[in-house]
Amino acid sequence: MVDKLVNSEANARRIQMVENCFGTSGQQLLVPGRVLVGEGVLTKMCRKRPKARQFFLFNDILVYGNIVIGKKKYNKQHLIPLEEVQLQALEDNGQYRNGWLIRTATKSFAVYAATQTEKQEWMAHINKCIEDLLRKSGKKPVETHAAVWVPDSEATICMHCKKTQFTMINRRHHCRNCGAVVCGPCSSKKFMLPGQSNKPLRVCLDCYDNLKSMKRDGNKALAGNNNKPANSTESSGEDDSGDDEETLKDNVTHDEPKFYADGKLEK
């Protein structure tokens, strides 16, 4: 079905509309061979709190951004190549329901749909796009993924020393290897994590010792594949730290997601 939409006027019109909603702050999305597979609002677990984000699934990339004016204007556009993506379903945990992890080599985070049905639809469509993309390119799935970050609100004290309380002076920091919230002294070391950056990144003391030991022992296991539980509701990346600028805040009217490649909508 996706292949039938490649050269359709409806597909080009939809992609152009997405471009217009992001304005000059966004990148060009209308390129040969690209299809808009689906779109909708998901709740993204950001560093400080859960926030509504508009997501657009294309056959080769996943795009999301802040909602400034519902269905009319978005900003802070993020593009994720689907060939780098791996999904991991999350179990329901209290108020956090219908969620899954979106994991890549440079950034990993949790998102939540409004219903179980929408979760299944999103995951099925994303996985189908990933499978088709990898099959056509002949590439293998990425095996190394960035750690998801524990939200600031989940830690009132350092997760490493278990002593330091976070205040205006004692700031929170995140270990780039395991995602834990730690204090400054417990994250004073840096280590190269090639999948995330070409510069040494802040890591906690435990991860630093483990990574250094692996390097010394000649272990080829790649850094970044932490062993956090699948029910984690964390977010990685610093790009969300200043996301509170959005106009709509959390007052976003929910509409069911639209998927154009399943034949149910007008082509």
Tell what function each PLM region has.
Residues 1-170, 174-180, 184-188, 201, ...:
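Membrane- and cytoskeleton-facing regulatory interfaces of eukaryotic small-GTPase pathways
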Residues 197:
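Flexible phosphate/Mg2+-sensing switch loops adjacent to catalytic phosphate-binding sites
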